[in-house]
Amino acid sequence: MSDQTATTSTPFPAPAKPAPAAARTKLILEGPIFSTLLRLSAPNVLNLLAFAGMVTFDGFFLGRLGSDALAGASLVFPWVMLVLQSTNSGMGAGVSSAVARAIGAGKSERANALVFHAFLLALALGAIFAGLMLLGGPTLFRLMGGQDDMLDAALAYAYVALGGAAAICLLNFMGNAVRGTGNMALPAGVLVACVLAHIAISPILIFGFGPLPPLGAAGAAWGLVLPFAVGGAWFVWYLHSGRALVRLTFRGMAPRWELFADILKVGVPGLVNTAFTNLSVVVLTGISARMGRDIAIGYAMGARLEYIMQPLAFGFGTAILAMVGTNWGARQYARARAIAVIGVTTVATVCGSIGIIVAIFPALWLGLFSDDPDVFRVGGLYLHIVAPFYLCFGMGLGLFFVSQGLGRGTAAAAANGVRLGVNVVGGLIAVYWLDLGMTGFFASVAVGFAVYAALLAWAVARVKEPGIAVAATA
């Protein structure tokens, strides 16, 4: 049964009466695992296409402004992705996990209260992101190697994109509340609408049109913030209207630490995990920027593909999270473990296949952004060395969602912290001590992916029934 109907009066899908909770929950608890995983993941393919479009088109348009604009935006891009991912697959997944476990346990009133607390957290986290970037942006981007026109472009992009972080947080938190009910289609549709709007208006804002002046790099940022603000407002209306399986209500609600904690116990490790992922790119971008602008651009364009691997994993991962979380909450532990194995294998296979293709044919990806031979040389070397290890990256990402569904995200954050250390320390040693140059630098990234997958596999395998944390997280 569909949870939404089309309308011509709003750019987003208009909600209809929801399907009974029992039908979707029964499918998650009793349906064939692989076909149910594919059924729940299918709408999230739209998420992949949306994020892929955003990542690709932003780089394409900014590249037309020149190398300084592209390099400046590349300094900011990991921070924008930090906000997007930490509120979607990080902190937002804490919302989804808590809601899924409440529904699995038959506690609908608790699920509704969790949505209210997620709303408060979205506003608070958005304000924190904006404040930190507005105050510390200039110093941060100088430390990352930004200077002159490159620094100006970075600041123009960052002040708008991260100043409007609350819009991103609200859309992702409320969307994850809906995903926690097992409804993947509606959040995917809203996100696609936002990204299509972003792609449509960004070139107009970047280059100008008619009476609209060109805004340069800041135009791409406005093209992100405005659609996400509209999408976030729509989700608030939808959840408040009572048309979803959970409801956002303010009447009679008061903040309760116990409910914040239920979200944060998964969300904070998820946020830290996402922070480690993006900090790795930030630091490696900074190291590469000090080796030269062309090296920085080449590395950034190669590493940008990893930002497509993550929403690809998210497409399957949100379904894995909902299925594992609901079955774990219903005390169907053996089924939850079987879902984990099948889900992780699927994500690793898909990511690994893409990695092999771009490792053999790097121009398929790099040609979208630049025709500079130096950029091709650096980016091609990166993909030759690192892309085959996307299988390990996919395995780690799949296990990350499993750990969140189990309500235990600390192990994933710890494993990603180790990966960050391997990337950064290994990269510095390779470049400045062993004098291995770019080859050693990129090899440290590949080794980091392998270590990440191995540690998470070990940690998740040690989760005990009924819901005892992995020993490493205790």
Residue ranges and their predicted role:
Residues R39, L62-M81, D149-A156, A217-A218, ...:
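Interfacial/gating helices of multi-pass transporter permease domains
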Residues T56-F60, L82, G131, T139, ...:
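Alpha-helical transmembrane segments of multipass membrane proteins
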Residues M1-N44, V99-A166, A197-I204, L212-V268, ...:
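Short alpha-helical transmembrane segments in multi-pass integral membrane proteins
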Residues L46, A50, M54, V83, ...:
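Residue-level hotspots within pore-lining transmembrane alpha-helices
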Residues R39-D58, V160, P227-G231, F235, ...:
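Transmembrane helical elements of multi-pass membrane transporters/channels
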Residues V45, L49-A71, F141-D148, I204-L215, ...:
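Helix-terminus/linker motif at the lipid-water interface of multi-pass membrane proteins
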